[in-house]
Amino acid sequence: TKKATGSNLTQSYVKEFLTAYFTKKDLGENRNRYLPFMTEAAYQQEVNTEKEPATQAYKGYVVDTKLKSATIYIDQENKTAIVQVNYTQTQLQKKNNYANAQTNVLSKTTLRIRYIKQEGKYLVSQLEPILIVDTLTASQEASLPNLNQPKTTEGETNKWQN
């Protein structure tokens, strides 16, 4: 297969980045693979996030992360991609010990990836998790008749209901 160069913002180019970003043996192990896809500032932000104590706490416990699939939406005009990603991980009970490990634990995330073009190549300038709400579900929930009624504690009679 032909390697995407990044001169165009395409699904295959975004997927190449996602593969580099989500495939790793352990925290930080994949930096050299995703660095070529990012601006220096975005890369530094990612490294800083990996160094945070809350993130470091999982090092050695959440391992073997692999990209499984990605749905990629590209907005060429704003140089942005919205990606819905499925990936698996192995979760260890003891650091670096695969005994009793939970393997292939499926996780999902949605990211907005902003790109800028530098020297003829699209680079990730910002990576942020986002939440996409299913408006059909939200509007169905909103149409429920008791949505805005006062909540009651157990054993209390709700005076609004007959």
Predicted stretch roles:
Residues 1, 31, 35-36, 62-63, ...:
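Generic detector of bulky aromatic hydrophobic side chains
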Residues 1-18, 139-159:
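N-terminal, intrinsically disordered, polar/charged segments of Gram-positive cell-envelope systems
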Residues 4-8, 76-77, 102:
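Short, solvent-exposed beta-strand/turn "edge" segments of beta-rich domains on protein surfaces
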Residues 68-76:
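Short amphipathic beta-strand and strand-loop transition segments with alternating hydrophobic
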Residues 79-149:
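Exposed beta-sheet edge and beta->alpha loop/turn motif
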